[in-house]
């Protein structure tokens, strides 16, 4: 019996990042990229329609950023897990992201294998971390 396939929505305002992540994740047999959004607003619309298991969310985007989009997403779809993928590695941003409801926080210069491990960990966790 094969394990369930993780359905992922990629959210980033940079097309090359979205497409690169989709291509990279598409090579994994246990991951299906169900959609790509370029803003927090579009992420909320697509998540409501596509019901992803995990949203891979950029932190800083024009319009609604990743923090606010995460807050709204976990309110409207608490079964969906959010992992921040960002170029910002500071502790304050990470705490803010976790307080908004994100389950994981990974910087964009993370090794590909570590990104996959973090994504799988976020998908399999049943609890939300607390950040104080």
Predicted regions and their residues:
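Conserved acidic segment of CheY-like receiver
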Residues: 4-17, 21-25
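Active-site residues of response regulator receiver
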Residues: 12, 58, 86
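Acidic catalytic/metal-coordinating carboxylates
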Residues: 39-42, 62-68
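Short hydrophobic/Thr-rich beta-strand motif most characteristic of the beta2 strand and flanking loop
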Residues: 30-38, 46
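Short amphipathic alpha-helix used as the core "switch/output" element in two-component signaling
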Residues: 45, 67-79
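Active-site T/S-Asp motif of two-component receiver
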Residues: 57-58, 69
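Active-site beta3 strand of CheY-like receiver
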Residues: 50-56
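Short, flexible helix-to-coil linker/hinge segments that flank and couple to helix-turn-helix
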Residues: 92-99, 104-132
């Amino acid at each position: 019996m094969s394990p369930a396939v993780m359905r992922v929505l990629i959210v980033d305002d940079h097309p090359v990042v979205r497409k690169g992540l989709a291509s990279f994740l598409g090579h994994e047999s246990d991951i299906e990229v169900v959609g790509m959004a370029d803003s927090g607003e579009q992420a909320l619309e697509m998540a409501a329609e596509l019901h992803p298991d995990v949203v891979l969310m950029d932190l800083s985007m024009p319009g609604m950023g990743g923090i606010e989009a995460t807050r709204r997403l976990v309110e409207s779809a608490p079964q969906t897990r959010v992992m921040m993928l960002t170029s910002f590695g500071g502790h304050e941003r990470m705490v803010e992201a976790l307080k908004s409801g994100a389950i994981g926080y990974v910087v964009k210069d993370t090794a590909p294998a570590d990104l996959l491990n973090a994504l799988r960990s976020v998908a399999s966790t049943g609890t939300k971390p607390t950040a104080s």
